[in-house]
Amino acid sequence: MDANVQIRPARNNPSQGNQGRNNNNKRRRRRRGLKLPPVVAPITSPGQMAEPANHANTRVNRGRTRVRGLRQAMMESPMAATSEAWIHDYLDPDGEYKTSLDDGKIPDGAIPQSTCGQFRGTVGARYPGLNSTTLPLDGGTWPLLVMHLPFFRHPLLFITTTSNTEVEVTNADLDAFANDWNNRTDWTEATYPSWAQVGNVFYMVVPTEALTDVPPPTQLGVSGLLESYRLTSSGVTAYFNAPTLVNQGVAVIAQFQPDKEHQKENPDIVAGTTQTGGTLQLGGSGPNYTLTMTIGDQVEFGGAAIPLPTVSMGPMPESGQLVFQTANLTFDVGNTITITTTLPPGSVTGMWQFTASNGTDTVTVDAGARLYAFGANLDASELNLQDINSIKIPPTNMNQMMQATPKTIQFQLNETKGFYMPLRAFQPVFEMTMATSYGPVRWKTPRTTVVDYHRAIGGLQDTIDSNFAIGVAAMTGMSTSTVPYFKVFRRFEAIPAEGSPWGPFASATPPKDDVALTVARTWTDLHPFAYPERYNGFGALFAMVAKTIAQIPRYVRSAAGVANAVTDCIESATESVASNSTSERRQRRARRVGGIARGARNLVGRIGNLSL
């Protein structure tokens, strides 16, 4: 071999010689990146300029399609801040995490401007007749029927019974309640915190404190406060406030579309009908008898019914006196009133017509006649039409609720510590409720007769929202020492009336956002009617709503795409909350097991010491 020839050692890895070349190629590719000139970000809001965005060091590599700006734009929320805020308010109405009232308007573009507000309150329901200083632990239980009402001035209604033989409020209890409600004109006894009593049935309605001193609309429905309104969200949270020793109880919860109707009271049915009624007691001695005839405030001589007690008494004297309570007598002097008496078979024994003068008139009957029924028929030339809000009582029996909707949910109250019921909107379009619909609200049941319904002279004065459901929570098996508390949050959107003090607070409404409306609708379709109490108290529902909104990509624009995306996001958020709940249970179980183990070790140590 030639000594001048040098042999290089063989390379074990051919790629080692290309290492420097590869590094140089990478540096060249990086240098070939295109630099973007500095740009100025657009104006984000009126009167505010965003900071200039310096993209001098931003590079776009060839062959790459995942541009950071595009990716961020695709993953941003598809809704405006006002739309997102309304979704939070609608799906989580009792959450204390958002308090801005201007963000509570419905983004449907239905009205150009409006004002909005919020009603808040906390009330408790105590077993009727229970002394607040006592705590009975005798094992007695009571049912409580809670209605989450879509009324503007009264959000809650409580009904209960003191009959120990009834597990829940029965149909007979509801009939007694409806009859008393429809004929009640003085609501002092039936307004929180007072219970109105009808036999063994008790009920009370919870008013909105903010509207206590606000004058109601006139008889023509003209309001000095607003022309129309609509609820934007409403929710009630029940806190199961029960002693530890007797903390049993079950709640069955559902929501129903209100079967309601705003109608004119038909005077043809009422005015020309002879009213029959109640027990007449023979007062004192002598030939005279007195019947006091009460006429309610609504009976402005125009034909509303005058309910009288059923007459049952002995032989009538020859003359008697019919006395009207002049304080409530509202028909004009000079109108004719017809009085009739009948025998038990129903034959007419006498009929008298006289003219109302000073409120007292004397009528004469046949000697020895037995009065069976007494009636009054008002003869009028002018009839007073009255607006009423007729509404049917929804299913309240636990079995009926289960049959009426598969989304009925049941809670064991000592486990859930209560419940959280956001009220759902069942209408596809959020309509406005006119102030002219203000009038008596009267309940009806499948057993209510036409005669009894049209003879009613009372009813709670209010308006019924056109969109939201009526929530029903049948709580049963609770100890009589249980005092559940209820928190109510309600938001509304209204068009102020001329000269209204709410007028200066009106502002423009957000633009229509179909994505936000679809998100809210899809959520309510997939979720139950109520949640455990911790979904409000611990913010679990707020976290689910926020996570769902954050996961909806901007590029999903069609309604079908939004619905599918929301479904996936809700399932993901639900699984997250469920996993958190599972981990919490595992941690509690681990703590219990650890405590048992420590106790066992201590016990073994003590036994060892004793043996020594």
UniProtKB/Swiss-Prot annotation:
It is found in: Virion. Pfam families: Peptidase_A21. Residues 11-23 have a biased composition (Low complexity). It comes from the Viruses. Residues 24-34 have a biased composition (Basic residues). Keywords: Capsid protein, T=4 icosahedral capsid protein, Virion. Residues 1-53 are annotated as: Disordered. The record marks 536-537 as: Cleavage. InterPro entries: Peptidase_N2, Viral_coat. One of its GO terms (cellular component) is T=4 icosahedral viral capsid. The keyword Phosphoprotein does not apply. Self-assembles to form an icosahedral capsid with a T=4 symmetry, about 35 nm in diameter, and consisting of 240 copies of the two structural proteins. Belongs to the tetravirus capsid protein family. This is Capsid protein. It comes from Nudaurelia capensis beta virus (isolate Pine emperor moth/South Africa) (NbetaV). The lineage of its organism: Viruses, Riboviria, Orthornavirae, Kitrinoviricota, Alsuviricetes.
